Every structure is written in C-alpha cells, then in structure tokens.
Amino acid sequence: MTKTFANPQLTKNGELKHLLSIEGLSRDILTHILDTAKQFVSVSDADREVKKVPLLRGKSVFNLFFENSTRTRTTFEIAAKRLSADVINLNINASSTSKGESLLDTINNLSAMQADMFVVRHASSGAPYLIAEHVAPHVHVINAGDGRHAHPTQGLLDMFTIRHYKKDFSNLTVAIVGDILHSRVARSDIHALTTLGCAEVRAIGPRTLLPSGLEHMGVRVFHSMEEGLKGVDAVIMLRLQNERMSGALLPSAQEYFKAYGLTQERLALAKPDAIVMHPGPMNRGVEIDSAVADGVQSVILNQVTFGIAVRMAVMGIVAGNND
C-alpha cells in the first residue's frame, strides 16, 4: 500500500496555512496568491492618503531573520504594517539564540507572547518546516528563505512581475542565469514556472554551478549564454553565492563576467521586448552590466515594489486559514 503524506503547508481542507515552499502547491493556489496581490498593489499607490487596510489588525507578526536581509525583511515589515499588524523585528545578535538558546525554545518563548505569525529566514534548509511543526494551530509560518532550499515569496513576486508584463505563461520562454546550484530563488522560480505552465524554462550557467536533475524538473540546460538567451521572453539573473560555496568553483569574478555576465550585446539575443530581472543584491560587473541593470528592459526595481503586494497577499491568505 502506498503511503501518502499530507502537505504541512495546507489545512485539512487544502487551504494555505503556512508558506514554506512553492513545491507541492497547486496552480490554483499560486494563481489565487497572484490575483490577491494584484488587488493589494493599489494600497501602495503614491497618491493614496492612507496606505493601510485592516486585514491583520490586532495580529502580531514576528520577523525572525537569522541571515542578513535588506529587501525581504523590509518589504515583509512594510507589508505587515500595511495590513495593520503589529510588527516585531527580533534582533538575532542581541537575542538569547546568541547565548545558546535553541531555535525551538526561542519560538516557544515568542509564542508565549501571543505571536500570530512568524516570518523566518534561516541558514539551515528546513528550519521553517521545523517551526511550523511545533507552533500552535492558530499560528502561521512564512519562509523568507531557508539555506539553499526555498524562497517562496521571491518566487511568487517573480511570477507576479512576469505575469504583469507578459500576461500568459503558456507561450513564454524564461531563462534563469548564474549560480543555480546554491540558489533558493532559482528552485522556487523553477517550481513556480513549471506549475504555472510556462512553455519553456532554461537554466544557463557553468557546469560547476548547475545542480544535477534539472532536466527531470522540466528545465533545458545551457552552458553558453549565446545559445541559452536566444529568443527568451524574460531573463532572471542570479548573483554568485560566495558565502555558500566551498572550494574553487570559478576561476575569478572577471572570468565569470566574460562568460556569463549579462551585457547589452547578449541581451540583444533575447526577444526585443524581453524583461530583465534580478532578486538582489546585484553584483554589477559580475553577473550583470550596469547598462543592462539600469536599462529600459530592466524591471528589477519593479520587482521590489511588487514584492510588498505579494507579501501582503501571502500574509492575508494564510492568516485566514486555520485547521
């Protein structure tokens, strides 16, 4: 008899109560998040006098970032505040975890303070899953990046950005370029693109920075930028994750740029209306040329803006679903 495993992200009714990974979520769930995010975009309009809605009024959201972050932590904080939540940013370096307290003991103590939601970034893959297993039924966990494993809200905001500019995934070719081996963003993007029916997903990079098994995920692999960029609709550039590398996987940053840096000449191989994306932080002159990053086809800053609406949508949806 085949043993089936329940998805820990879902309620018994199949609704999203935690967001831990895009893997295992249906197209309907992803589309619902993207559609909800579209409704929240107007909350951040510059001409809107009060940039708030009362969806999470009275709820406490704890941001627990055990790794450094600028865009993700800040946009989660803005998103929670625009939903009218009370936001607590834990200073990890000054917390009891720096004195040897375990992750679960930290979570249990914060839960005793009536936390309603934890937004967690951690260097260890699977840490948000561990937390989700041990919180009370009414508490929700959102993964803001765990090791190499997943970065689901980045994947979702990337999908929102692509859909905003390209509408329909079914005719698109999307290339993900760079250090895919160490990238949680790449994994989340690949799962999201294939789930949403993207016509073709490409991975471009040196052999040393591409994980095995990409073909089994429905990805076409290229080791040449010139070949991989031909006719693509969107290019997602990734930085070199030097902090996760062990050993000499590359000769030098300069040599990497010569082979895999996105220049205007290489971008010209894509479709004329192709968009350029990057999850940040960017390393100009390593994976992307400044002329491209700041060019007319770049939507990198728009990704950051859309990230607020997407994270508002995720928080609002999970907060409404309990077992």
From Swiss-Prot:
<feature type="binding site">
    <location>
        <position position="239"/>
    </location>
    <ligand>
        <name>L-aspartate</name>
    </ligand>
</feature>
<comment type="function">
    <text>Catalyzes the condensation of carbamoyl phosphate and aspartate to form carbamoyl aspartate and inorganic phosphate, the committed step in the de novo pyrimidine nucleotide biosynthesis pathway.</text>
</comment>
<keyword id="KW-0665">Pyrimidine biosynthesis</keyword>
<comment type="pathway">
    <text>Pyrimidine metabolism; UMP biosynthesis via de novo pathway; (S)-dihydroorotate from bicarbonate: step 2/3.</text>
</comment>
<dbReference type="GO" id="GO:0006207">
    <property type="term" value="P:'de novo' pyrimidine nucleobase biosynthetic process"/>
</dbReference>
<dbReference type="GO" id="GO:0005829">
    <property type="term" value="C:cytosol"/>
</dbReference>
<dbReference type="InterPro" id="IPR002082">
    <property type="entry name" value="Asp_carbamoyltransf"/>
</dbReference>
<dbReference type="GO" id="GO:0004070">
    <property type="term" value="F:aspartate carbamoyltransferase activity"/>
</dbReference>
<feature type="binding site">
    <location>
        <position position="71"/>
    </location>
    <ligand>
        <name>carbamoyl phosphate</name>
    </ligand>
</feature>
<protein>
    <recommendedName>
        <fullName>Aspartate carbamoyltransferase catalytic subunit</fullName>
        <ecNumber>2.1.3.2</ecNumber>
    </recommendedName>
</protein>
<dbReference type="InterPro" id="IPR036901">
    <property type="entry name" value="Asp/Orn_carbamoylTrfase_sf"/>
</dbReference>
<dbReference type="GO" id="GO:0006520">
    <property type="term" value="P:amino acid metabolic process"/>
</dbReference>
<feature type="binding site">
    <location>
        <position position="72"/>
    </location>
    <ligand>
        <name>carbamoyl phosphate</name>
    </ligand>
</feature>
<dbReference type="Pfam" id="PF02729">
    <property type="entry name" value="OTCace_N"/>
</dbReference>
<dbReference type="InterPro" id="IPR006132">
    <property type="entry name" value="Asp/Orn_carbamoyltranf_P-bd"/>
</dbReference>
<comment type="similarity">
    <text>Belongs to the aspartate/ornithine carbamoyltransferase superfamily. ATCase family.</text>
</comment>
<feature type="binding site">
    <location>
        <position position="154"/>
    </location>
    <ligand>
        <name>carbamoyl phosphate</name>
    </ligand>
</feature>
<dbReference type="GO" id="GO:0044205">
    <property type="term" value="P:'de novo' UMP biosynthetic process"/>
</dbReference>
<feature type="binding site">
    <location>
        <position position="151"/>
    </location>
    <ligand>
        <name>carbamoyl phosphate</name>
    </ligand>
</feature>
<feature type="binding site">
    <location>
        <position position="280"/>
    </location>
    <ligand>
        <name>carbamoyl phosphate</name>
    </ligand>
</feature>
<dbReference type="Pfam" id="PF00185">
    <property type="entry name" value="OTCace"/>
</dbReference>
<feature type="binding site">
    <location>
        <position position="121"/>
    </location>
    <ligand>
        <name>carbamoyl phosphate</name>
    </ligand>
</feature>
<feature type="binding site">
    <location>
        <position position="184"/>
    </location>
    <ligand>
        <name>L-aspartate</name>
    </ligand>
</feature>
<comment type="subunit">
    <text>Heterododecamer (2C3:3R2) of six catalytic PyrB chains organized as two trimers (C3), and six regulatory PyrI chains organized as three dimers (R2).</text>
</comment>
<dbReference type="InterPro" id="IPR006131">
    <property type="entry name" value="Asp_carbamoyltransf_Asp/Orn-bd"/>
</dbReference>
<feature type="binding site">
    <location>
        <position position="281"/>
    </location>
    <ligand>
        <name>carbamoyl phosphate</name>
    </ligand>
</feature>
<dbReference type="GO" id="GO:0016597">
    <property type="term" value="F:amino acid binding"/>
</dbReference>
<feature type="binding site">
    <location>
        <position position="99"/>
    </location>
    <ligand>
        <name>L-aspartate</name>
    </ligand>
</feature>
<keyword id="KW-0808">Transferase</keyword>
<dbReference type="InterPro" id="IPR006130">
    <property type="entry name" value="Asp/Orn_carbamoylTrfase"/>
</dbReference>
